[in-house]
Amino acid sequence: MKKSTWIRITNRRNEKLEKIHVNHVDLFYEKAGQGRPVVLIHGNGEDHTIFDRTAHLLEEKFTCYLPDSRGHGKSQWTGEFHYRDMAEDLIQFLEKLNLRDAAVVGFSDGGIIGLLAAARTNRITSLVACGANTRPEGLRILCLTGMKIHHFFSRSPLMRLMIREPDIRDEELAEIHADTLIVAGQHDLIRKSETDHIASEIPGAEEVILPGESHGSYIVHSEKLAEIILDFLDGKRGEKF
């Protein structure tokens, strides 16, 4: 089956990737820097290189792990996708590499994966979830409608994932005990009410809405995300935003 070409992001770092086998799939990832582990999870149809500028700034203080999610980049194509499987990929990734006190930064689908994983493992002690939703209806109606039309013609498994899932329950959000920052752009594809709800259901979570930003404008090949991460992990708690 041909891979989806929706929002295909090209590899710009030309780095040497490492391979790991978790949850019955082979994942490829980049590792750089030294210090506390930070795992950056990209969104649907992308690969880890969207975080090129972010990782460059973080690796002076942290060990950055940038995996390609299953079915993305160079990682194994599985043909069918579910967010809970991808969250299990992340949990086993942390376990197999023996990463503890990890910070997970997820964008869009990566944010969903981060929420699900953080509810199930204490290896994640900090979480930054950007542009995430707990259900398809958390997307703005025009966005969700566009995805359904796209899927009707493409039958893309990755597009089907977004229009049928996630299904994260409030009880699961309440199980997240990591220090959590929920981020969205002012003009995000995610409804503001959805972002507010996620932040309200996670104990002690903080929320930042970035003025003038869209769903991925502060993420993809941008240094703005690194500033947010550094401030959050340094305990500045969004003072600049």
Regions found by a protein language model. Give the residues of each.
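Alpha/beta-hydrolase fold catalytic core
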Residues: 1-38, 62, 160, 230, ...
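Active-site loop/oxyanion-hole signature of alpha/beta-hydrolase fold enzymes
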Residues: 65-102, 227
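Active-site nucleophile elbow and catalytic-triad environment of alpha/beta-hydrolase enzymes
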Residues: 157-172
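Conserved hydrolase catalytic core segment
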Residues: 100-136
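Short beta-strand/loop motif that positions the catalytic acidic residue
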Residues: 176, 182-184
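Conserved HGGG/HGGXW glycine-rich cap/lid loop of the alpha/beta-hydrolase fold
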Residues: 28-74
